[in-house]
Amino acid sequence: MMYLPYAQLPDPTDKFEIYEEIAQGVNAKVFRAKELDNDRIVALKIQHYDEEHQVSIEEEYRTLRDYCDHPNLPEFYGVYKLSKPNGPDEIWFVMEYCAGGTAVDMVNKLLKLDRRMREEHIAYIIRETCRAAIELNRNHVLHRDIRGDNILLTKNGRVKLCDFGLSRQVDSTLGKRGTCIGSPCWMAPEVVSAMESREPDITVRADVWALGITTIELADGKPPFADMHPTRAMFQIIRNPPPTLMRPTNWSQQINDFISESLEKNAENRPMMVEMVEHPFLTELIENEDEMRSDIAEMLELSRDVKTLYKEPELFVDRGYVKRFDEKPEKMYPEDLAALENPVDENIIESLRHRILMGESYSFIGDILLSLNSNEIKQEFPQEFHAKYRFKSRSENQPHIFSVADIAYQDMLHHKEPQHIVLSGESYSGKSTNARLLIKHLCYLGDGNRGATGRVESSIKAILMLVNAGTPVNNDSTRCVLQYCLTFGKTGKMSGAVFNMYMLEKLRVATTDGTQHNFHIFYYFYDFINQQNQLKEYNLKADRNYRYLRVPPEVPPSKLKYRRDDPEGNVERYREFENILRDIDFNHKQLETVRKVLAAILNIGNIRFRQNGKYAEVENTDIVSRIAELLRVDEKKFMWSLTNFIMVKGGIAERRQYTTEEARDARDAVASTLYSRLVDFIINRINMNMSFPRAVFGDTNAIIIHDMFGFECFNRNGLEQLMINTLNEQMQYHYNQRIFISEMLEMEAEDIDTINLNFYDNKTALDNLLTKPDGLFYIIDDASRSCQDQDLIMDRVSEKHSQFVKKHTATEISVAHYTGRIIYDTRAFTDINRDFVPPEMIETFRSSLDESIMLMFTNQLTKAGNLTMPFEAVQHKDESERKSYALNTLSAGCISQVNNLRTLAANFRFTCLTLLKMLSQNANLGVHFVRCIRADLEYKPRSFHSDVVQQQMKALGVLDTVIARQKGFSSRLPFDEFLRRYQFLAFDFDEPVEMTKDNCRLLFLRLKMEGWALGKTKVFLRYYNDEFLARLYELQVKKVIKVQSMMRALLARKRVKGGKVFKLGKKGPEHHDVAASKIQKAFRGFRDRVRLPPLVNEKSGQLNENTADFIRPFAKKWREKSIFQVLLHYRAARFQDFVNLSQQVHIYNQRMVAGLNKCTRAVPFERINMREVNSSQLGPLPVPIKKMPFRLDQIPFYDTQYMVDPANSISRQAFPNQLLTQHMEDDEPWDSPLQRNPSMTSCALTYNAYKKEQACQTNWDRMGESDNIYNQGYFRDPQQLRRNQMQMNMNAYNNAYNSYNSNYNNQNWGVHRSGSRRNSLKGYAAPPPPPPPMPSSNYYRNNPNQQQRNYQQRSSYPPSDPVRELQNMARNEGDNSEDPPFNFKAMLRKTNYPRGSETNTYDFNNRRGSDSGDQHTFQPPKLRSTGRRYQDDEGYNSSSGNYGVSRKFGQQQRAPTLRQSPASVGRSFEDSNARSFEEAGSYVEEEIAPGITLSGYAVDI
């Protein structure tokens, strides 16, 4: 409706004299001016009149025109129109000028003067604002923008409410609006929710919420969430409890209660404005208003000379868009992807594209950080930026890698648990850069111990020079797995670090691929020595023509800057490298050893061999002499070892000679191994030198950062790429277990309504790679040990018929990874995997005169292939709190460098197992994930390639993670742990708190939290609940620390003032006899400690050898006896169950025979009345028996299947002949750290949980999409961009995904959950029995017609079910319960007969047309050690690609109902067409045992 007479408005030209701008809003500017007609000072509000602002101008004009006569509203003098020829016209509102400015400006000026408004002044301003709002509400007007900047003060202290641009008229006092509009910090929850709501819910109570926020603003100087992005602020308003004053204890109870009443999240329970004005906080003001006005006038006068403070430009949100003055509305993209309204791939990609174009590389997914490599990530940040992320919550700042470091640091201090940060993604996605930024910020947070942080940063820089190299897609790629274990003392000050390196890609040293650059340190070293003119000292030549440097004649054009092509910069880098090593206590001799080893490796690469008959000989012997001189080894031994080796056969040593090709391979293996030992030596020395500051400053706390290879694919992929990608595959599996599977299982076990989380489970792919004996890595090991080539690998892969590992060509295999399918060349697999260095060469190096080189080849290796070294014992400051870290000490060595050699595959498997164990130590271990994504393939700043990003999103499960964080509970804590952490937030310090469920609920209610859930033993928190509690915890801890520091200062001052200063030497000298006794006592203790060493080694934590030999036979006897006792109890329990079952069968048999004897006389059919309903004729109904609920998880029985598991260490002693043992091989399953406790509780998960777990693990509901993931080729070549095939299927997938939940809930599963949760197994059909033995496959192969007839006959009637028959014995038509009167399931639970809860996954493998011999044999599903089922391999290898699941769930036989004919649930007749009662026999109903009634048709037998 038009209120403004636009055409008749006068022109303001020559009517006003404009002075200065006094305010600026989103839609207008306000100026102080003088009206020339009457010299009156007025306020001019000028705004553009266009289509966007027309409605707001009309509404503001109507409000000013009709209601400006109220004393708390500004006077309205008129409106004018200024025509503009080049733009929209301007509308000038002329209003009363308030010389005092805004209320919030006065508050901030007082705060700058270290003064604060008293509560009565705040109450007066709020009361006057309430009166203005009541006047508007009385006239059915919603203001919708009440805040401190819109409350004006006159020079005499009057209060005026202004700015009606967002005000709107409603139909009645309780009328509703439905537009999400306003300033974010002052929005009520219903206003924020209006963006998603379809019905209008905004009433005048929204102004009450804004009034409460304004009260906080006047008290603290700024509103809550003032420093947050609008999306973060709106998310906090909805999800978290209402905000409070910054320091509530500094204010009275009345103002806190007023704010609490105003900020009621439920709009229906929130008071009206007329009720708020009656609150004691406002009514207890003094009646003399003139006094209050004079006080405010004095404060205005006091703050007049204070310089105007800078204010951020105003903004407001309008239906998902952010508006600022003179700027186009920008769509509001959330910083947290878990806050997306409609989480689909398109919305996520659009949000990421917008953020990266705005220069924002990071986004949150709840508590997980998503990082996009924008090709311009900063390496250095000022101290002010670091300070923004110090002890802050996740939502207080923009998403950044520093927030992950800050949260991990706080969790480490609060929970006293080590924190892990795992970075994952493909190559060049920014993992190593983010890891370095994490370390920088952690050094900032832990700064305090002199020199500790500097040594840590320098050490990391030196290690990266050793292990980084250039690849075709990354000029600074990390070529190993690095663990940075940063240690901190009790107070959080950094004390040092422990560095662990695994899987160094040492083969890179000698590779012939020119596109793969060598490690950076080689280029640094050579260019530095060349610049220093020291080449002759290290037997090097002047040109860079070294085979291992791989320097091309001409530098090829590249978008990346490689270290190889920057000789000038390399000089400074190597100088920095040596300075770092000097700073961390490397002596000159050790630095010289490093130089000589690097020079020797370069020379080894230039050794040439020539053919001498059948064997090889060294062509350039002068290089061999130079190498022997550098390494200080015997030249003749070294020369001989290059072309000869010793073969021991039958106890006889024979000399063998290499061929030319074998000699080259041996030379390259020596160079690679020498470099690997050098890197291990340097890292071990760094760890050793770091141990002293850790002992001095303490190392009770730790944060471990895991930086590793990125997932990669080149034009030719070998064994190195297979290992790298398999490691990433395992890290993805660990992510799935922690984010998805653990949550669903815990929710089901705790009786929480289980949600359906979908993700792509890559366990089957990993099983095909790592499971013994058919996993690909075991196949490679078999080929390597049997000296076979790739033919054996290709044959074994072809025999598996797996869809995850396939034969691609004659020499190539394809592996379906979680990112896509990659092709690997197997021709060099076996040679590379052997990693064989001749023992003769090892012995040559052991005889080196250089102590460091001798040490590198003398000490043993760990199972991961790393060098061990002797560490000096350092006395810790507090031995009671000393922590042990994974150092490569001598006690960790178990592999000789000469004997018992391990393959690279064995080292790789042990490394993967070690990493999984470290990340899965306990359920409450803090693991923080950083998911890194590469934004493009062109290396352009802020470039965004949608197909590339989308493929990585699919691989990393970004969409599934968003849904999981929206619906799930990321934190799950036991009651005692939860109350131990947070009880002081809601309970008094002297209040007794029991660790119960009720107290957990009381804590949540006192804190006004929402979204949580309580299970039987655990608290379930959403990620924003956990963040809110952490923020409260941090605030309270700061207060505690401040109080403690003040009390300590007070006590210290009292002691000094009272003269109670403790002085040393106060005690006089003791008698010489006493001194002699003390010396003798100390000497005797020292002598005994030397004579009797401790039983446990302090460094390794293991028993010494003598003690272990003494204890071993007793421990073995005790263990065998314990196992025997367990087996006896197990066998006794099974015998007892068998006796119970036999007794029941005996009773059943006796009563059955007795009943049949009474029913031998047949009843004529014509005498049966089918319509009889008289109870007197039918007889009384049996009385139902009261039954106790039956729960398997309450039975104190634990599955002992693991005792006979061949993979278990106990069973290895019992079944030594059944294992394929290999020397020093670890047979532990690759996923053993993630397998759950094999107890009966885990076996007793309900069918619903199993159904959902199988659905998400196998993607049975979206088979096409899951097939697309592992069948799609993974390709990374910036020169040849390929269309992402997944993009073409996205629309169909999104449509299917949106309707997934409804389809899932409406699916007919054949069984239904009971309404009660007391019995999670109640209501499920019993499993069908195995079919009768069938003829062999040869019989059917020769008689196909007989096979067809038998198949049709079996499918014509349901299989018999004796368990269902027993159930029906105790029921009548009036009893709807499904529990038996006796515990027959308990009898069957430990027998081979399947239980009722397992019926839904059993399947008859009776497919037509199959020639397999066991196609008609009943096959129960396999069991893992956890007791949970997984799909049979046959299902995964089906040609349809449907994982073998949809048939098991969708085509299952429905169990017969209670009202079916008893014959259908008892034994089936041979002739299924018999329908008459005469053929069926006579109907009999008789109680054969107490509570057991037999009813059915009887025939003579």
UniProtKB/Swiss-Prot annotation:
Region (Actin-binding): 913-934
EC number: 2.7.11.1
Localization terms from the record: Cytoplasm; Cytoplasm, Cytoskeleton; Nucleus; Membrane
InterPro entries for the chain: IQ_motif_EF-hand-BS (IPR000048), Kinase-like_dom_sf (IPR011009), Kinesin_motor_dom_sf (IPR036961), Myosin-III_kinase_activity (IPR052409), Myosin_head_motor_dom-like (IPR001609), P-loop_NTPase (IPR027417), Prot_kinase_dom (IPR000719), Tyr_kinase_AS (IPR008266)
Function: Required for photoreceptor cell function. The ninaC proteins combines putative serine/threonine-protein kinase and myosin activities. Essential for the expression and stability of the rtp protein in the photoreceptors. The rtp/ninaC complex is required for stability of inad and inac and the normal termination of phototransduction in the retina.
Record family assignment: In the C-terminal section; belongs to the TRAFAC class myosin-kinesin ATPase superfamily. Myosin family.
Protein known as: Neither inactivation nor afterpotential protein C
Source species: Drosophila melanogaster
